[in-house]
Design a protein with these regions (language model features):
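Glycine- and aromatic-enriched membrane alpha-helices
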Residues: 1-210
Length: 210
């Protein structure tokens, strides 16, 4: 099921990155290719780092790494070279893996690793766009730090920082407001029983045996 879901996400991501241009040209093709390249290399990088640290390769890690690559390359897909997409994929696979590991050690309640994969990956992608962007692959874009424009890099970092602050403040505020009317977090006993059974009185998968 996880593999099927990841495949659907991957396919849908073409709409994010390539389809959002609303036409077919060289930039569309670049975004399409970069999406595949970054996701593939991120999956391999995550798998290898997990293998080194945990002594066993895990299929779930491979899939999570692919999603990390997709999330990270999204800001940059139409503005960088395929070679840069390889770098973005490898860096995102490694960095997001350790972000998730940090989350686990700190025991944050993030069952889907949204912070470590999408949050850290998105921040990383915006920052790397500021470093690697080039007009060679998208004349309508800008040149990044490595191509002689430190101003664009600073703009991207500033945008990433303020977006992170905005997301944290308003998410926290909304959760506090919601918590006034209903419990945001379920109890540990409900989690142990399973939310399908504890909240809805039924199991989604009856074939599962305790």
């Amino acid at each position: 099921l996880v593999a099927l879901g990841t495949g659907l996400l991957w396919f849908g991501w073409y709409g994010f990155n390539a389809g959002s241009e609303m036409r077919v040209d060289a930039v569309t093709a670049t975004a399409f290719l970069n999406t595949d390249v970054a996701a593939s290399f991120a999956a391999i990088a995550w798998l290898m780092v997990a293998w080194l640290n945990e002594k066993k390769p895990k299929f779930l890690g491979l899939l999570t790494g692919a999603v990390a690559g997709l999330a990270t390359v999204t800001p940059a897909a139409g503005y960088v070279s395929p070679t840069t997409a390889v770098i973005i994929g490898i860096v995102s696979g490694v960095v997001c893996y350790y972000a998730v590991e940090m989350k686990n050690k700190l025991q944050w309640d993030d069952a889907l690793d949204v912070w470590g994969v999408h949050g850290v990956g998105g921040f990383l992608g915006i920052t790397m766009l500021g470093i690697f962007a080039t007009k060679q692959f998208n004349p309508a874009g800008a040149d990044g730090l490595l191509h002689g424009d430190p101003t664009f890099f600073l703009k991207e970092v500033t945008a990433a920082v303020f977006s992170s602050i905005w997301a944290f403040v308003f998410t926290y505020a909304m959760l506090r407001i919601i918590d006034i009317f209903t419990t945001v977090k379920v109890s540990e006993s409900s989690e142990e029983v399973g939310l399908d059974e504890s909240l809805h009185g039924e199991r989604a998968y009856e074939q599962i045996v305790d």
